[in-house]
Each structure stands twice: as C-alpha cells, then as structure tokens.
C-alpha cells in the first residue's frame, strides 16, 4: 500500500530498532517499527502489563514485539521497569535524528468513565509530569503504582517530555488502560512526518 494514501509521508529510511537488555534480574528483547500497522506480540510474564503494552503498540500504529524474562518470584517491579527502559531506548533509536517529524503530539482519550489527557514533546530532554486518581493496589498480579514508574522509565530512555493527566476515572483497569491509549495516540501524532525538511528545532538538533 502506498503510505501517502493514508495521509502519511513515506519515511526516508525504515524507522525501527531492536534492543536487548540483560541484567542479573531480567532479560528483555524489544523490536519496534515506528511506521507499522499496530501489530503487537507481547510476553513479559505479567498479563496485565502485556495488555497495556499491546494497547500502546496498537493505538500508536507501531509494530511491537516484546519478550521479557524476569525475577517474578520476587515481584514484577524489575520486569516492568526494565521492559519500559528497553522500550524507551528502542523508541529513541528508531527515530534517529528526528528530521521531518512533527515533534509535538497530544490526545484526549476516554474509556467509559475514565478520561486521560496527554501531551508529548520529542525534545531530547526527559521530563515527566503525571497525575492519576487513587485506586486499588492490585490488578491481578500487577501493582497499579507501577504505571507511573513505567512512564518514568520510558521517558528516561526515550528522552521525551511527557505530560499525563487522568482527568476522571473510578475503575482501576480503565484508569491504567486509558493512559496507555492516550500516550499511544499522542506519540502517533508526534512521530508523523509532516514534509518539512530538517529537524523541528531552532537548535538544529533534538
């Protein structure tokens, strides 16, 4: 299919990256194609986290494959954190010099009673602002406090500025899922090639 038929400019080179991260606690493999079709294959050993990362890939239009083996006998913290770090690194590497991208993206996404607003700047500088309602501590084996840490870890390696505000929500599943969907839509907007030559910064680099 001609990429221009969907309103997307064809990338000059494939925007993709593969990252392997090995520690004494985890083994992580991430393959990311920015200009994909939303095809996802996620296996971290944490079912709810798999579901969240699938939302991220699908709604961003990324092809995303993640395989993580971690010390789940301890808890899910290392698995979740290291996966997010590797994903952020893959995102940064896939974008390269960021020439021709829109750079900024935003989204307002509902999920039943939950509502999330996200704004992103692919600035090259990691910064996170995050707010969400209080909720139950566990969804299955997933600690809901980990979601903020996902974004902290992703932002640290992706080198982006990310604002996330959950404006409404009662159901913990919805409060978490709507964040991943909204971030996905904002990233999809920010990585789009807009036909303007060069890097979108007066500094000449991002």
From Swiss-Prot:
This protein's name: Imidazoleglycerol-phosphate dehydratase
InterPro entries noted in UniProt: IGPD_sf, ImidazoleglycerolP_deHydtase, ImidazoleglycerP_deHydtase_CS, Ribosomal_Su5_D2-typ_SF
GO molecular function: imidazoleglycerol-phosphate dehydratase activity
Native organism: Acidothermus cellulolyticus (strain ATCC 43068 / DSM 8971 / 11B)
Catalysis: reaction(s): D-erythro-1-(imidazol-4-yl)glycerol 3-phosphate = 3-(imidazol-4-yl)-2-oxopropyl phosphate + H2O
Annotated stretches, region: Disordered: 1-24
A single BP term in Gene Ontology: L-histidine biosynthetic process
Matches recorded under SUPFAM superfamilies: Ribosomal protein S5 domain 2-like
